[in-house]
């Protein structure tokens, strides 16, 4: 069932290849398929003919099948005709008949969810498990719904609440949590479902493909609480935690329920997990903590909008504050470049946010002033750089960023100026440089932000500072292009003119040499 918005729940395979009445525009007549006239009659909803056949002498073979192994009982269950189901069972129809697709009357009845039909089938000896070809039991099918009455009936007749399907090793409890069915979760927990069961862990072989970027593959290994966290089922999470679910049990990538809830904008569920003592400082394989994720999600552009507001009562900013109050370390840094997300126009271009990125750098990149204030209040380090030498000040100024980036796409110059002021007041050095030797002024020039240029100059930044290629901020404002001719930095004539003017007004200091 599991991606990250993380892995999707496995879909039910079609249990009956002919289960749609409108499968063929021209219905098959009884005469056209003589070997199974009763099956054809029921399939075509010719219930009067079917009842007449059952009442006739000699009686028809109620175990007859069509070419795919489907019986009249299969179709009677599918059409939810309780009376016809009972007539067929009294006539000794095979209650456990399995067609070529692994479907039994019981597995189909679980899809329909009619308790009367289920009770009849069980009365006549149906296998309460009735797994399909993938090992999905009748209880698993019901667990995805809120049909608690039907599930109780199966459990009363011995259905295994800890059975696993063969595809991903998922249990009924996992299905219930993944589909946000708290009443079903409670029922399964009350009858002994394992709250810490884990689905199959996928060991993907390393492969080299024509696609140059690393591709994520579902790692599996989800617990019921991880499914609830991904779905944002707060009620499910409360039940599972009360029943003893491990709040910090991770998937193979180190993703905790708290982190997963946050990554999926499920802030109410994340806040609950913080309140019940989840470890706020656990990070995953990439070094993402819940705090980093909360800051990231708070201004993440999706769907062409500046952000995608969560439908939860808890806001992203409230979650950030809750995490900080609970002791979240504001200075944890990314260990690896984080995986791509299913985001609009996200092609992994956010290369600035790489190894060493802190929540403060991410907030500065997005111009998230409220989050920056909170992080600084709780001790965020303004000097910690990424491996590319990007500090919070340089991130705020736009260094190493691109219009192709996902994060910070809708940041404004006004936000950048406010972020710079905040950071300088908190101790950032105006002369900080990245791995290219560029200063915050180079970043402002990259974006053509004249007011930011003036703000930096007002704080005595060196307008003559050159990067490792000997370029001043004015040179950057002139624009650059790659060997193919595609502009990597758009030209900003007004910004270049402003910088040339400022350079003329300030004598080049001796220290303005290329670093």
Language-model region placement:
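Ankyrin repeat domain, specifically the short helix-to-loop turn at the C-terminus of the second helix
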Residues: 54-60, 86-94, 119-127, 153-160, ...
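Ankyrin repeat boundary/linker residues
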Residues: 66, 99, 132, 165-166, ...
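Leucine-rich solenoid repeat scaffolds
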Residues: 463-504
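N-terminal segments that cap or nucleate solenoid repeat domains
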Residues: 26-75
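Conserved ankyrin/ankyrin-like repeat signature
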Residues: 49, 83-84, 116-117, 149-150, ...
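Start-of-repeat signature of ankyrin repeats
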Residues: 34, 69, 102, 135, ...
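Ankyrin repeat A-helix N-terminal signature
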Residues: 40-44, 75-81, 108-114, 141-147, ...
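Bacterial N-terminal signal peptides
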Residues: 8-18
């Amino acid at each position: 069932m599991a991606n990250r918005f993380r892995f999707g729940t496995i879909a039910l395979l079609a249990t009956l290849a002919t289960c749609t009445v409108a499968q063929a525009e021209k219905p098959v007549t009884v005469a056209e398929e003589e070997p199974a006239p009763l099956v054809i009659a029921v399939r075509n909803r010719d219930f009067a003919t079917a009842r007449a056949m059952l009442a006739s002498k000699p009686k028809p073979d109620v175990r007859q099948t069509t070419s795919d192994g489907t019986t009249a009982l299969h179709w009677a269950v599918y059409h939810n005709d309780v009376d016809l189901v009972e007539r067929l069972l009294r006539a000794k129809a095979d209650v456990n008949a399995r067609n070529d697709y692994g479907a039994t009357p019981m597995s189909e009845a679980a899809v329909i969810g009619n308790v009367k039909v289920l009770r009849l089938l069980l009365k006549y000896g149906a296998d309460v498990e009735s797994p399909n070809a993938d090992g999905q039991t009748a209880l698993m099918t019901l667990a995805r719904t809120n049909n608690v009455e039907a599930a109780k009936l199966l459990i009363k007749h011995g259905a295994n609440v800890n059975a696993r399907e063969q595809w991903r090793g998922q249990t009924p409890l996992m299905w219930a949590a993944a589909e946000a069915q708290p009443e079903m979760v409670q029922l399964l927990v009350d009858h002994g479902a394992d709250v810490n069961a884990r689905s199959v862990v996928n060991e993907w072989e390393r492969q080299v493909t024509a696609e140059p970027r690393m591709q994520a593959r579902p790692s599996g290994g989800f617990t019921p609480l991880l499914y609830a966290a991904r779905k944002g089922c707060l009620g499910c999470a409360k039940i599972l935690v009360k029943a003893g679910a491990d709040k910090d049990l991770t998937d193979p990538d180190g993703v905790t329920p708290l982190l997963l809830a946050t990554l999926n904008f499920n802030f109410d569920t994340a806040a609950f997990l913080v309140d019940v003592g989840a470890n706020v400082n656990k990070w995953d394989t990439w070094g993402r903590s819940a705090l980093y994720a909360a800051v990231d999600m708070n201004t993440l552009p999706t769907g062409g909008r500046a952000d995608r507001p969560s439908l939860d009562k808890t806001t992203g900013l409230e979650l950030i504050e809750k995490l900080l109050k609970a002791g979240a370390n504001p200075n944890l840094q990314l260990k690896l470049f984080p995986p791509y997300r299913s985001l609009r126009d996200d092609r992994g271009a956010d290369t600035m946010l790489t190894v060493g990125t802190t929540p403060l750098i991410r907030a500065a990149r997005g111009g998230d002033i409220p989050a920056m204030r909170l992080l600084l209040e709780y001790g965020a380090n303004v000097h910690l750089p990424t491996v590319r030498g990007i500090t919070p000040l340089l991130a705020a100024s736009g260094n190493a960023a691109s219009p192709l980036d996902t994060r910070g796409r809708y940041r404004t110059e006004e936000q950048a100026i406010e972020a710079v002021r905040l950071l300088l007041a908190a101790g950032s050095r105006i002369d900080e440089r990245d791995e290219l030797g560029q200063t915050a002024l180079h970043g402002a020039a990259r974006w053509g932000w004249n007011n930011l240029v003036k703000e930096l100059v007002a704080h005595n930044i060196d307008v003559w500072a050159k990067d490792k290629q000997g370029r001043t901020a004015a040179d950057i404002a002139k624009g650059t292009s790659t060997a193919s001719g595609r502009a990597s930095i758009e030209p900003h004539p007004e910004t270049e003119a402003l910088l040339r003017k400022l350079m003329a007004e300030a004598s080049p200091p001796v220290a303005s040499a290329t670093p």
